[in-house]
């Protein structure tokens, strides 16, 4: 059965977050998530594992999750069925407060999106603006070469002085080196070789 073309806030809140299948909701519109390539999946898994391995036992406490629902602020719109915004980022790093789809955005320290041919425009424009407006401190975008066969670079964005826009902190080539919220060095080879 096909989902309705729009999803209201009330319908979303009345159901379990994972009951709608592979969709995102943008201003109430249902947007289907496309199946990803094997390389995309490999990079997401390896990067999430590297981030988990970078957590320090002494803290601070961070959780690393992949493809979990994150509800962003509702759109400013007078129609109740055009407001809901739910994304499933490839990877999130958040504090250890209990997970709640409606408030988790306030606990996220870093979001990572791994681009694909079907998500490139959204990952590099729309989501970058949305995540910054939500006040998420860091955003990484993993890019592939023109053949989509290997990682070419990772753009690292951090909030600017306003706390509402991202600026490029670094463009990583050959290795991702992070100092916050976790200290991590991961070569592109480690993230993508079978």
Predicted region positions:
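Gly/Pro/Ser/Thr-rich low-complexity, intrinsically disordered segments predominantly at protein N-termini
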Residues: 1-194
């Amino acid at each position: 059965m096909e989902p309705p073309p729009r999803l209201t806030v009330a319908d979303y809140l009345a159901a379990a977050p994972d009951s709608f299948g592979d969709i995102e909701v943008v201003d109430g519109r249902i947007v289907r998530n496309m199946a990803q390539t094997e390389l995309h999946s490999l990079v997401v898994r390896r990067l999430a594992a590297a981030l988990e391995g970078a957590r320090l036992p002494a803290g601070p406490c961070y959780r690393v999750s992949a493809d979990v629902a994150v509800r962003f602020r509702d759109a400013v719109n007078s129609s109740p069925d055009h407001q809901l915004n739910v994304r499933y980022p490839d990877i999130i790093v958040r504090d250890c407060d209990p997970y709640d789809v409606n408030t988790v955005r306030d606990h996220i320290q870093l979001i990572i999106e791994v681009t694909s041919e079907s998500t490139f425009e959204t990952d590099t424009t729309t989501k970058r603006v949305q995540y910054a407006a939500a006040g998420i401190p860091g955003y990484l975008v993993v890019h592939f070469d023109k053949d989509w066969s290997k990682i070419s670079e990772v753009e690292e964005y951090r909030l600017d002085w306003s706390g509402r826009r991202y600026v490029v902190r670094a463009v990583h080539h050959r290795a991702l080196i992070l100092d916050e919220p976790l200290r991590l060095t991961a070569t592109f080879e480690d993230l993508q070789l079978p």
